[in-house]
């Protein structure tokens, strides 16, 4: 469950290490984002020679949450922390590699590229 001011680690190779959510997209009253939701983020910690710089604003998709996601069969998939993948304006991933597992809930038309790049899909 991600809300405004939440800090997330970055699960790709764009050079960003940590981002902060500044807006949950999808309606003016929408407060929380879960796995598969698009949020607006700002880069808080970046690698020295990365593709992105500190202070820049991007779209991102949430790929892991500590809150987890409930499946239809009743199982619950949780992670140790919150993570996101940075996206460009067309909602395509900026990075070329994804680190760590992602969930099957991302297997939609919009985020198939992220699922195919991920080393493990839970």
Swiss-Prot record:
Part of the 50S ribosomal subunit. Forms a cluster with proteins L3 and L19. In the 70S ribosome, L14 and L19 interact and together make contacts with the 16S rRNA in bridges B5 and B8. GO terms for molecular function: large ribosomal subunit rRNA binding; structural constituent of ribosome. This is Large ribosomal subunit protein uL14. GO terms for biological process: translation. Belongs to the universal ribosomal protein uL14 family. HAMAP family: Ribosomal_uL14 (MF_01367). Binds to 23S rRNA. Forms part of two intersubunit bridges in the 70S ribosome. Signal peptide: none annotated. Transmembrane segments: none annotated. PANTHER family: 50S/60S RIBOSOMAL PROTEIN L14/L23 (PTHR11761), LARGE RIBOSOMAL SUBUNIT PROTEIN UL14M (PTHR11761:SF3). GO terms for cellular component: cytosolic large ribosomal subunit. SUPFAM superfamilies: Ribosomal protein L14. Gene3D superfamilies: Ribosomal protein L14 (2.40.150.20). Keywords: Ribonucleoprotein, Ribosomal protein, RNA-binding, rRNA-binding. Coiled coil: none annotated. It comes from Janthinobacterium sp. (strain Marseille) (Minibacterium massiliensis).
């Amino acid at each position: 469950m991600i809300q405004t001011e939440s800090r997330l680690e970055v699960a790709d190779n764009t050079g960003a290490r940590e981002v902060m959510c500044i807006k949950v997209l999808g309606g003016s009253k929408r407060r929380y984002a879960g796995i598969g939701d698009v949020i607006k983020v700002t880069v808080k910690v970046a690698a020295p020679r990365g593709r992105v710089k500190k202070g820049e604003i991007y779209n991102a998709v949430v790929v892991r949450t500590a809150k987890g996601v409930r499946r239809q069969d009743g199982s619950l998939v949780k992670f140790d922390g919150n993570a996101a993948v940075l996206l460009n304006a067309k909602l395509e991933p900026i990075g070329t590699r994804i680190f760590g597992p992602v969930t099957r809930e991302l297997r939609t038309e919009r985020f198939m590229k992220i699922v195919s790049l991920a080393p493990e899909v839970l």
